[in-house]
Amino acid sequence: MRITGTERDADPDGRPVYLLGVEIAQRYRHAVGSSSPFYEGLEQGVLRATRCTGCGASWFPPRRFCEEDLTETDWYDLPGTGTVTAATRVHSPPPFGGIDPPYILASIRLDGVRGGITHRVIGAETPQHGAAVTVKFIDEAPAHPLLAFAFAIEGATP
């Protein structure tokens, strides 16, 4: 906790008035149920998906049960590469904060799994359909766990 105070003017009776500022930072952890391995992976710098123990289908976003045969799934690490299927430049902040506009959002088909993700792409240029991207983990503490990573266009200069 950090407390700051500065003298400001005076009240109507001539007494000094102080502005007191209090900043409190709290860190907490909570379980996110069967998706916990995904968030633990983010802390470790890897994207995780699930694979069906019955038919072998792979899923991202991760699923506890396979959509094909309802068998339980196992967790595994993705290579962190994919292909842009659509992209746009966004000029308003996201509802959860943590990103200053403008920023780029892209639908990305991840390599090796069914499904994909709509997520932020780092860089000044909006990627074209078919552009190859690689996951990049952000060094600073994110405002939301899903902001712990973004994608970079392969071969692009930052």
Question: Where do the PLM segments sit?
Answer:
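Residue-level recognition of beta-strand microenvironments
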Residues: S58, T81, A87, A124, ...
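Cys/His-rich short segments
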Residues: E40-T81
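Short microdomains enriched in Cys/His and/or Lys/Arg
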Residues: H30-S36, E72-D100
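Glycine-rich active-site loops that engage anionic ligands at enzyme catalytic sites
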Residues: T85-V121, H129
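A broadly conserved sequence feature marking short terminus-proximal activation segments
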Residues: M1-L47, A152
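Short coil/turn motifs at beta-sheet boundaries
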Residues: G45, W75, I99-P101, Q128, ...
